[in-house]
From Swiss-Prot:
UniProt superkingdom: Eukaryota
Name of the molecule in the record: SKP1-like protein 9
Keyword Nucleus: yes
The encoding gene: ASK9
Region (Interaction with the F-box domain of F-box proteins): 95-153
Function: Involved in ubiquitination and subsequent proteasomal degradation of target proteins. Together with CUL1, RBX1 and a F-box protein, it forms a SCF E3 ubiquitin ligase complex. The functional specificity of this complex depends on the type of F-box protein. In the SCF complex, it serves as an adapter that links the F-box protein to CUL1.
Cross-referenced InterPro entries: SKP1, SKP1-like, SKP1-like_dim_sf, SKP1/BTB/POZ_sf, Skp1_comp_dimer, Skp1_comp_POZ
Length: 153
């Protein structure tokens, strides 16, 4: 028995054939699938590049519940950890794509990965990581550190 496939089109013109059941993890794709004319010609995803869409599809295929190929929770956690071993720019692109496509599990995984990266860093390191300019005066910063002394211990 063959499974129904749909075509997803990235912002840079790449097309990907995906099993409909795996694609159903993306809420925006479900909305497009209800409009039959979109599925016939492919579903355009103007906010996702081909490189990132390929990764999203890989994630959805792995997380798709497939009775024929069950995956234990431990195996899936290990796979997720290895999947997120990417440069920070790619992780941020995955966060944006997961948010746009409304894939909560991928969004949560990518955000948790960023949280683990910055965990234990100083405020200065976190500002540098996110490219945030420090707009506090030295006096304001000192007052905040005094008020929240427990957080800096």
């Amino acid at each position: 028995m063959s499974t129904k496939k749909i075509i997803l089109k990235s912002s840079d013109g790449h097309s990907f054939e995906v099993e409909e059941e795996a694609a159903r993890q993306c809420q925006i794709i479900i909305a497009h699938m209800s409009e039959n004319d979109c599925t016939d010609n492919g579903i355009p995803l103007p906010n996702v590049t081909g490189k990132i869409l390929a990764m999203v599809i890989e994630y959805c295929n792995k997380h798709h519940v497939d009775a024929a190929n069950p995956c234990s929770d431990d195996d899936l956690k290990k796979w997720d950890k290895e999947f997120m071993e990417k440069d920070t720019s790619t992780i941020f692109d995955l966060i944006k794509a997961a948010n746009y496509l409304n894939i909560k599990s991928l969004f949560d995984l990518a955000c948790q990965t960023v949280a683990e990266i910055i965990k234990g860093n100083t405020p200065e390191q976190i500002r540098e990581f996110f490219n945030i300019e420090n707009d506090l005066t030295p006096e304001e910063e000192a007052a905040i550190r005094r008020e929240n002394k427990w957080a800096f211990e």
